[in-house]
Amino acid sequence: MRALNVSRYFYLIALFLLGHSALAQDLKQEKMEQLGFLVGEWIGTTKVFENGVVTKQGSAYENISYDLDQNILVIELNTEFLQLRTIVYYNVEDQKYYYHRFSKDGAARYPAEFKDGQLIVWKDDKTRFFFGKSADGGFREYGEQLIDGEWIITFEDTFKNTQ
C-alpha cells in the first residue's frame, strides 16, 4: 500500500512538471512571436552619427529569420561598415530576451526587452539599440548613447522588406 502512495506521489510530481514545462514553452513561443515583424529580407541604408551629424552613410542588407522551431531569431546584417550575426531568444526563467552579437572582433551578450512594439537592447546603462516598425511597413534600427543626461543617436539603419 505504501508503494502505491509513493508511486502516486511521483506521478503527481511528473504531471506537475510536464504542465509547467508546457506553460513555459507557450510563454516563450508568445514572446518570440512578438518579434515576427522583423522577419524578412531587408534592404536599406545605414548612417553613422557623431555629435548629431552624419559622418558615414551607405547601403545595408539584413536577413532575419526564425530558426530552431521559432525558438531563436537569427539576424544577419551586412553594411559597408559592419557585418554582424545575431541570435535573439527569450529566457523564461529570467523573463527577458537576450541578444547575442557576433562580429569579426568578437562576441557579446546583452539583455533586451520588448516594449511599446519594439525590441530594446541594453549594451550597458548608457548605450541602447532599438528595433521597431516604421510607418511605411519597413523597420528602423538605431542606437543611442546617454551623454550628459541626454540620449544621442549614434547610428540608424532603415529598411524595406523585399519579400
What are these regions (language model features)?
Residues A60, L82, G137-R140, I153:
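Asp-box/BNR beta-propeller blade signature and adjacent active/binding-site loops
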Residues A135-D148:
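Low-complexity, intrinsically disordered Gly/Pro/Thr-rich segments
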Residues Q145-Q163:
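Edge beta-strand at a domain terminus
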Residues M1-D26:
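Bacterial Sec-dependent N-terminal signal peptides
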Residues L27-I43:
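N-terminal helix-cap/turn-to-beta initiation motif at the start of protein domains
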Residues G40-W42, D94-Q95, G137:
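A short, compositionally biased
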